């Protein structure tokens, strides 16, 4: 089999369309066949007997750095798998122009010089899809596998919507090499590339964000809990869509909003808010234990699917951890932090002893999690910076050996960002100061940004990194500290009020403009401009914070869910 991606020649032209808003609906005709139409076309609408899902798309990339998408499933009577397929198809039609551009900027060229790797990867993914299909068929009443079925059908629908092939036959061999599928498994790819020994391609690095910064901050007098995440990634990934999905599965988290990308039904960052009033984020942790890669098999559920299931089904941090831990794939190994805002009483002295914050870490064959509420109220913050916290994970991942080899940069409590968070977390008093900290980078002046390098500092050693500012001719003890296509590309923040409507404040693009050593990112002057595809992106990234108001409020849903749950429990 030849697992080669096809370049989409028309993508650039399609991406230049001037239309800013699109609404697409998937429905069923009276005879049961699927149909879709663009809102406003009455002739098409009259063919429908039952609406299934509608996607509302609003493109503000050039104005705010973000596009916005809401997908609403119409009825709880629609089977899970059809909810997923209809939602995915509507999104694929509404966002296809950005999908085209994102594919060019990220996936194209991934298999160049790596045919053997992509052959093995494709066979692995086909086996994985077949295994999940078998489990779904053998367990039709199992709620977990119903959720898996919803998720994979959402992916199939997304691909079919993008290709305008409503109801087309599913071919796993074609799906497994489709660029949209590759975008879906972007996080999992980092570990799969290690397992199948992908050769390094300096011209194309496509994987998950790899590194991020995160902070959960308890304000004085329990005034609020601020919840923030900064994605670090290739600058080629900066076409962004903030999304809100509203399913009708009856689950506590059936409605959720998240920061995301074209062609991705997951966050990938990850930053997610659910109608169960859970706020969820992750920061990736490295796995340096090559022997553990043997535990990665096709008979598991990849992280991108397990996370979606946990988001929808959990009403607490513990439930999230338990759902996420099933069928651990050992890929996209992260530290996940779940804050349950239902348990937090803003401004009250007396707070629950447990249940507010839960921390989960994964490695192949290992899921470690525990409640960290007491820690949060004692220390007033929980940071995330790509180093594992739990000793079992540190040992199993061989992170302790990396500390021995390279020093404190790989340690949990002495790595630069750990020290910066420890020093600066008390500067956070409100949303604005949280954004300021999470966008901070003063690498030429901050003593905590220093390294055994020439020049003696690195723009990587900051809460919001800008590795493009490191000199090309600099010398560094390891590549992560040097010049590369890698930096902070956003910030997202929510609090106990915003989460009621699944809102968050977000800034798109790299940090810049505060000091002369960290200029505003501009493709016209960037040394990466000829090396990194960035079709459809604004040239100059100098956007203000945005708090987008969704069309529908999720707060009412959760109270209705709680009422129904109590009624059913009393029967």
From Swiss-Prot:
Q: Which Pfam families match?
A: Phospholip_B
In its UniProt record, a GO molecular function of this protein is: phospholipase activity
Query: What is the main EC category here?
Result: hydrolase
Q: What is its EC number?
A: 3.1.1.-
Q: Does the keyword Transcription regulation apply?
A: no
GO BP annotations listed? phospholipid catabolic process
Disulfide bond positions = none
Q: What GO cellular-component annotations does this UniProt entry give?
A: extracellular region; lysosome
Q: Where in the cell is it found?
A: Lysosome
Q: Give the residue range of the signal peptide.
A: 1-18
Q: Which UniProt keywords apply?
A: Glycoprotein, Hydrolase, Lipid degradation, Lipid metabolism, Lysosome, Signal
Carbohydrate attachment sites? 62, 149, 442, 473
Q: What does this protein do?
A: Putative phospholipase.
Please report which protein family the annotation says this sequence is part of: Belongs to the phospholipase B-like family.
UniProt protein name: Putative phospholipase B-like 1
Which organism encodes this protein? Caenorhabditis elegans
